[in-house]
């Protein structure tokens, strides 16, 4: 989706909303976030996982790290990405941990209609983000209160990673800062986030660069904001994690 008159990308701590007209198909990719795909006006989207045929969905949730390709060209829709270590993400993982891609029923239809209407009426970013959170809350229901809170040391480590993205981020200094041995930290980090330390840092770099890019930075400027060596590294990482080129979400 282009972040233009036909689409917007809105980001918050722990998630983002991509809303508008779906563009080019996304090749096989995998990302750290849980993905919630909500086509508008009774439309649909197609997903493919490795070794399987394409499957149609009227709405779907994709688990974190699940490889998939995606196609919904010309379809108006919302895509909500939720980091699995966030409170909402932990609740979503609790509900859908055994399923790579799962269909969503029409119990969320009113939230989808509200998102569609708000986008059509050019609602503010704040209003759209609140509607995205409403959709997430509808999906997680009571499970949010039963999700295990993150380990405090890993929560602190995640903060430190975000603070250091403009430069090198390595495991040993972060482990020392939260008073864990590197080996114990590596194990606990994987246990808490579902991903290794280096891939998580790369995801956070991508998130930081994307936030800058959709606000109008050039590819090179956005790459440097996230600590990438250059725009080529940013572009390769973006395609690996989203299946499309960053130019596909070019800002206005």
Predicted regions: what they are:
Residues 185, 189, 233-234, 238:
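Short hydrophobic/aromatic patch on the recognition helix
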Residues 181, 229-230:
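Short coil turns linking two alpha-helices in DNA-binding domains
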Residues 168-173, 191-229, 251-252:
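Terminal helix-turn-helix DNA-binding modules in bacterial transcription factors
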Residues 2-98:
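N-terminal regulatory/effector-sensing and dimerization cores
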Residues 93, 141-144, 250-252:
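Short, charged, intrinsically disordered terminal tails
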Residues 99-178, 191-199, 203:
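Short, Lys/Arg-enriched, Trp-marked, Pro/Gly-tolerant hinge/linker segments that flank
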């Amino acid at each position: 989706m282009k972040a233009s008159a036909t689409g917007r990308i809105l980001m918050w701590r722990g998630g983002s909303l991509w809303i508008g007209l779906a563009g080019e198909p996304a090749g096989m990719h995998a990302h750290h976030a849980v993905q919630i795909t909500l086509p508008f006006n009774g439309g649909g989207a197609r997903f493919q996982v490795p070794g399987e045929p394409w499957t149609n969905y009227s709405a779907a949730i994709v688990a974190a790290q699940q490889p998939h390709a995606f196609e919904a060209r010309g379809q108006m829709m919302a895509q909500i990405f939720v980091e699995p270590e966030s409170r909402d993400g932990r609740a979503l993982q609790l509900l859908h941990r055994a399923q790579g891609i799962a269909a969503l029923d029409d119990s969320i239809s009113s939230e989808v209609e509200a998102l569609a209407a708000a986008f059509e009426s050019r609602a503010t970013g704040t209003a759209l983000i609140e509607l995205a959170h409403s959709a997430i809350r509808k999906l997680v229901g009571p499970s949010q209160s039963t999700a295990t809170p993150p380990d405090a040391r890993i929560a602190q480590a995640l903060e430190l990673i975000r603070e250091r993205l403009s430069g090198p981020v390595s495991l040993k200094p972060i482990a020392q800062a939260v008073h864990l041995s590197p080996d114990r930290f590596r194990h606990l980090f994987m246990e808490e986030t579902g991903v290794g330390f280096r891939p998580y840092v790369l995801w956070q770099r991508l998130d930081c660069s994307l936030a800058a890019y959709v606000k109008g930075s050039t590819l090179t400027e956005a790459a440097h904001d996230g600590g990438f060596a250059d725009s080529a590294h940013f572009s390769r990482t973006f395609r690996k994690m989203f299946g499309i080129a960053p130019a596909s979400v070019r800002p206005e």
